[in-house]
């Protein structure tokens, strides 16, 4: 039986392994397993985020949009963009003279986001791509964002290095992610995550396993200070983070200076 503080189960010997929730799996399998989760939840992704955050993800995204300070004419890349919430806001701010891309490794997720942007009257270019191998020129974007996506990436360091590569000097990376909650709230948060959330996933989406993985993936994600160090290692300066709702989520940001 797994607990919120369990160690990952072992992958087969002789293979490079990584974590998939609390499981240790061969690296080659993680992307496939994550894809299966998000194919399953794509049509109810906003419901999933509402369940995981008690609706607060909308407030956190609004804070991220404000910190991005996108201006007319800017070029913006939204990675793992899901249903397009950030891309929609960025496109409105960048205006017709700007350029905003919505990307996701998962075609099902990208289709939902693309359709919603079209329904909003916004023509935003989209691309299915891996954040570890971005198909964009170096020093191209003024802003790069990733919301609730980094924790699902196999090699977070490679992904952060790629995000830094495509930033212009003076450009900013923003990483919004579930994080390490303040200790006094941890017992209640763990109980909610590992009991209530899977139960609601089963009732709302008939998919208990995917929601259990999502809870586990949050616990395996680096804490705030560790992630800040990873941004610095990727080549970013002026790195800082903002705890949101007592650390249930955190917004990290860094600037490429050279």
UniProtKB/Swiss-Prot annotation:
Q: Tell me, what's a Pfam family for it?
A: Ubie_methyltran
Name of the coding gene: ubiE
InterPro entries (UniProt xref):
SAM-dependent_MTases_sf (IPR029063), UbiE/COQ5_MeTrFase (IPR004033), UbiE/COQ5_MeTrFase_CS (IPR023576)
* Biochemical pathway: Quinol/quinone metabolism; menaquinone biosynthesis; menaquinol from 1,4-dihydroxy-2-naphthoate: step 2/2; Cofactor biosynthesis; ubiquinone biosynthesis
The answer, when asked if Methyltransferase is one of the entry's keywords, is yes
Q: What catalytic activity is recorded?
A: a 2-demethylmenaquinol + S-adenosyl-L-methionine = a menaquinol + S-adenosyl-L-homocysteine + H(+); a 2-methoxy-6-(all-trans-polyprenyl)benzene-1,4-diol + S-adenosyl-L-methionine = a 5-methoxy-2-methyl-3-(all-trans-polyprenyl)benzene-1,4-diol + S-adenosyl-L-homocysteine + H(+)
What protein name applies here? Ubiquinone/menaquinone biosynthesis C-methyltransferase UbiE
The species is Bordetella pertussis (strain Tohama I / ATCC BAA-589 / NCTC 13251)
Question: What Enzyme Commission number(s) apply to this enzyme?
Answer: 2.1.1.163, 2.1.1.201
Q: Where does S-adenosyl-L-methionine bind?
A: 83, 104, 130-131
Q: Where is the signal peptide?
A: none
Keyword list, A-Z: Menaquinone biosynthesis, Methyltransferase, S-adenosyl-L-methionine, Transferase, Ubiquinone biosynthesis
Give the UniProt family note: Belongs to the class I-like SAM-binding methyltransferase superfamily. MenG/UbiE family.
- What's a single GO MF annotation on this record? demethylmenaquinone methyltransferase activity
One Gene Ontology BP term is:
methylation
Q: What does this chain do?
A: Methyltransferase required for the conversion of demethylmenaquinol (DMKH2) to menaquinol (MKH2) and the conversion of 2-polyprenyl-6-methoxy-1,4-benzoquinol (DDMQH2) to 2-polyprenyl-3-methyl-6-methoxy-1,4-benzoquinol (DMQH2).
